[in-house]
Amino acid sequence: MSPANQRHERVGEEIAHEINAMLAGELKDPRLEVSVVASEVRVQPDMKHARVFISVKGTNKEQSDAIKALEHASGYIRRELVERLQLRRVPELHFTLDLSQEHVERIERLLKEMKKDNPPAP
């Protein structure tokens, strides 16, 4: 992996860490009272944009509301990242719902159902 790619990954990890710290207590929006976690951040090579994948435990409405709340707070989050990370340029943040955990849970549920419906042969 090239040093540039390593840097983007490191910056993405640092951004995710700081956003999670903000979610743990600094962001006071009722739409963020459900379990919300920045699961991954992908930073573009030019460092101008970052896709922030957000995992939300809740209903579809709660998930949608949490993404809207984060988009509304993106200016504040970005200013905080400037101070905390001391980067020359903090990327513009784009929040996306991370459905990977839901897919894992769905697959596990389907596998359990298959196992229950088809017991092992004696």
Task: Annotate each language-model stretch with its function.
Residues 1-49, 55-122:
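Charge-rich, low-complexity N-terminal segments
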